[in-house]
Amino acid sequence: MDAFDVIKMPIISEKTMKLIEEENKLVFYIDKKATKTDVKNAVKELFDVEVKDLNTLITPKGKKKAYIKLKDEYDAGEVAANLGIY
């Protein structure tokens, strides 16, 4: 899967802003067929950061979310600023 096909769009809300600031996490809507390995590789390719932990879930509306915790040497705030969401 192509990295742009895996990651659909960032989720921007008060909750995700808190996660960026306090837990060094980013939250994205991802393709429903994407695996955790696909998501890790896409994040590494698109944002040049290493993933420490990754959790996925499918919402009741049928969309798949990924909560991506970055390694300590990377800052989620900088990645979010480059995306224009922070």
Swiss-Prot record:
Signal peptide: none annotated. This is Large ribosomal subunit protein uL23. Binds to 23S rRNA. One of the proteins that surrounds the polypeptide exit tunnel on the outside of the ribosome. SUPFAM superfamilies: Ribosomal proteins S24e, L23 and L15e. One of its GO terms (cellular component) is ribonucleoprotein complex. One of its GO terms (molecular function) is rRNA binding. InterPro entries: Nucleotide-bd_a/b_plait_sf (IPR012677), Ribosomal_uL23 (IPR019985), Ribosomal_uL23-like (IPR013025), Ribosomal_uL23/eL15/eS24_sf (IPR012678), Ribosomal_uL23_CS (IPR001014). Keywords: Ribonucleoprotein, Ribosomal protein, RNA-binding, rRNA-binding. Belongs to the universal ribosomal protein uL23 family. Part of the 50S ribosomal subunit. Contacts protein L29. The gene is rpl23. It comes from the Archaea.
